[in-house]
């Protein structure tokens, strides 16, 4: 089962989603964490994070898995690292790449086959889980 939560920034989506997930025993996922994981990896691997074709290639290559405590990136659990100022600086640009969005959305859909989810984030109730 998947519960998708949409809404404007600052509306309490994350708080409600986390509380509901905990109460129901569901996995809580914020799709933004996956976009941040792609950006984090791009920053680790690229000398020029503005090279969008290279970011797309990294998104296709990196292994991303949703976990209860963060995102597993190439086998390593990442959480705090995904919120660095450098990730903050680039994540919006990287998340706008259509192929990156396809990859993130595919991972979210894959997770539904393994867990009950409460998920929030970009295009979640309109594109990913309409």
Map each language-model feature to its residues.
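P-loop (Walker A) phosphate-binding loop of NTP-binding proteins
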Residues: 8
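Alpha-helical residues within the helix-turn-helix
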Residues: 22
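Active-site signature of alpha/beta-hydrolase-fold catalytic machinery across serine-
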Residues: 19
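Hydrophobic positions on the alpha1 helix immediately C-terminal to the Walker A/P-loop
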Residues: 16
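ATP-dependent small-molecule kinase phosphotransfer cores
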Residues: 33-117, 123, 128
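Conserved lysine of the Walker
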Residues: 13
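Hydrophobic anchor at the beta1->P-loop junction of P-loop NTPases
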Residues: 3-5
